[in-house]
Regions:
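Active-site anion-handling motifs in enzyme catalytic cores
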Residues: 1-381
């Protein structure tokens, strides 16, 4: 049996895309352990996988006292993880396969908890896979290396992470993010969409947080839209890809929409599932995006794309596709001037046809990398 774990819910449509694509790649019944199963059902994942809740249950009484003693003696919180997520761990079966599907969860706080999951699953006889992942090289300390070495298989979605992970765990292969095989659903286009001449834009609160000056990042988006309206006859479609409370793309996008809607050329796409969002992105002339899986939707459908990136995954994916990240990724941490995003858009516009031709040439073979990950999982059974 194959299980997917460490899934935070489908209001992050990148997470939803990973689940749908993984199901397509593995072509077998999957069990999804989710911390927000209600959101998964909202977007129809219950029609794709069997959803189980992996909620955190508070410790109390004797269990809480035992945890405190264990923590004092060992300095580890693994006891807390094991018992607060006992619904998941009680279901772990010897010989079953468990895919950690967060992708870049090791790049954020809480990687010790990921290590706890990995260790406990192995103690119960399960096999673990670090699936479609990215990893910041600077995050590889001794404790993390010990954890990473424990995985039975690692499928790295870009070469920067691959080199880092391969040095620690020889069971590491280079693949493409599973979402490159995501199905596309084309809904009717909204009024005002210019067929073949609509520029897609995705912005996120996370980008504003990662920028040295969040105000400059927002101003860069404002200036970009104004620049497109002033220098082209294209329409602009604002497309959200994450709608989680306190991290909702619709907040900055709605603010931008309200400012520029009087132009008659700016549209705001509402929330949809990831396949439907890919349908809109695939029909854009070009795409400028902050969310990784929004940009993957563009790359995979050969839409010339500029990424406003903040991590290794953006750089690594662009480097693997184009041979360089220069001009294709604007690191948000380095953003100093509101004109930079518009300047990079101008480069994209000037090279639009050559970029599209390159994507059409390389994408079929690149997408096949995702299937090598599925083949590697089948060999674990």
């Amino acid at each position: 049996m194959i299980n997917l774990y460490y899934h935070g819910g489908s209001e992050n449509h990148g997470c939803e895309a990973i689940v749908r694509s993984t199901s397509k790649l593995l072509s077998t019944k999957l069990f999804l352990w989710s911390t927000a199963p209600n959101t998964d059902c909202t977007y129809g994942l219950d029609n794709v996988v069997s959803i189980q809740e992996d909620g955190s249950v508070p410790l109390a009484g004797l269990k809480l006292l035992t945890f405190k003693m264990h923590h004092k003696l060992t300095g580890s919180d693994i006891f807390y993880t094991k018992f607060s997520h006992r619904n998941f761990f009680s279901a772990v079966q010897c010989g079953d396969i468990y895919l950690s599907i967060g992708g870049d969860n090791y790049c954020y706080a809480g990687k010790d908890i990921l290590g706890h999951y990995n260790q406990i699953i192995h103690e119960k006889g399960g096999k673990t896979v670090f699936w479609g992942c990215s990893f910041e090289p600077s995050e590889m300390d001794a404790a993390t290396a010990k954890d990473i070495a424990r995985y039975n298989l690692i499928t790295a979605r870009e070469s920067i992470s691959y080199e880092t992970l391969k040095a620690v765990n020889p069971n590491t292969i280079l693949v493409a993010d599973p979402a490159f095989v995501l199905d596309t659903v084309e809904l009717p286009l909204p009024e005002g969409w210019k067929d073949g001449n609509t520029i897609g834009i995705n912005a996120s609160p996370l980008i504003m947080q990662c920028a040295k000056d969040g105000g400059v990042a927002y101003e860069a988006y404002r200036h970009l839209i104004k620049h497109i309206l002033d220098t082209t006859d294209a329409a602009v479609a604002l497309i959200p890809h994450v709608v989680i409370e306190n991290n909702d793309d619709r907040i900055p996008l709605r603010n931008l929409y309200e400012e520029f809607v009087p132009s008659g050329r700016v549209l705001l796409i509402e929330d949809h599932n990831c396949c439907e969002l890919k349908g809109y992105i695939s029909r854009c002339r070009m795409f400028i995006g902050a969310r990784t899986h929004a940009t993957i939707a563009a790359y995979s459908t050969c839409v010339p794309t500029l990424v406003l990136g903040y991590s290794v995954k953006s750089k690594g994916i662009a480097r693997d596709i184009f041979g360089t990240e220069e001009h294709y990724v604007l690191p948000v941490q380095e953003l100093r001037d509101k004109n930079e995003l518009a300047d990079d858009f101008d480069w994209l516009l000037a090279n639009e046809e050559s970029i599209r031709s390159h994507l059409k040439c390389v994408m079929p073979e690149y997408i096949q990398r995702a299937y090598t990950a599925a083949e590697a999982v089948s060999r674990l059974k």
